[in-house]
Design a protein with these regions (language model features):
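Hydrophobic alpha-helical transmembrane segments
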Residues: 1-129, 133-242
Length: 242
């Protein structure tokens, strides 16, 4: 990495932390975790890879603040006035960072960008499905399709499902705009792979939430981490298979 690229990464990290402080998107521990994750992705990957993570974080913050008081009154809002902690940061950014670490350790064979993008797409899809879909009371179990309480783990609603599709598609388009040269497919091909992986990972998150989180085997953040890891694996596999 040239000095100019390192300088860009440092400036982006500074901007990221500044925006998070002003918007209260992350608390103190969350800021430290985001700085560590961002450094790994920016310095071992590329500044454009880091920009995708920043795009997700800003989008997630907007979705969290959307109708926040109403969600808070109903008991569906994030705690700490919407500020997310280090567990949230690691749950959504840990898998992308690990993917970049492994990609760098293996000599950068070329799958890093797609693995990162698919993983972040899962986080984006799940965040929008949760923050927007929770306002839709037409909730059914993703496993049994029975009616379940709004906000229940494993619950899905028409609005939530649509939000998950839109979220993964928006992230895929952003990834293409920022990282097109890092993909081996055409623009449409990359968008399809990333958006499908993001949406599928969101469904994996819901299934794990209903089957394992509800039974106490996993926590919310563990489920998020496994789902984003699934996305990274889909991206890795697609590089060699598709």
């Amino acid at each position: 990495m040239e000095f100019t690229e390192e300088a860009i990464v440092l400036m982006m990290l500074g901007a990221l932390l500044g925006v998070c402080i002003v918007s209260r998107a992350l608390d103190g521990a969350g800021l430290l975790a985001a700085a560590a994750i961002g450094s790994i992705i920016g310095f071992l990957g590329h500044w454009t890879w880091l920009s995708l993570l920043i795009f997700f974080l800003l989008s997630a913050s907007i979705a969290t603040r959307w109708r926040y008081e109403e969600k808070k009154r109903l008991g569906f809002a994030e705690a700490n006035d919407g500020s997310r902690g280090w567990k949230n940061a690691v749950a959504n950014g840990g898998a992308p960072a690990i993917a970049v670490l492994l990609h760098d350790a293996m000599g950068s064979p070329g799958w890093g960008a797609i693995a990162l993008s698919c993983s972040v797409a899962v986080a984006m899809s799940d965040t929008l499905a949760s923050e927007i879909g929770v306002m839709d009371s037409r909730t059914r179990s993703i496993v049994s399709l029975r009616v379940v309480p709004t906000g229940a783990n494993g619950g899905m609603s028409p609005t939530g499902m649509l939000s998950s599709v839109v979220g993964s598609l928006i992230l895929a388009i952003a990834a293409l705009g920022l990282m097109a040269d890092d993909f081996v497919w055409s623009g449409l091909g990359a968008v399809v792979i990333i958006s499908v992986a993001g949406w599928a990972g969101c469904q994996v998150d819901s299934i794990l939430g209903e089957t394992l989180e509800n039974r106490g085997y996993l926590g919310k953040h563990s489920v998020n981490f496994l789902a984003t890891s699934f996305g990274a694996l889909v991206g890795y596999a697609s590089f060699y298979v598709i």
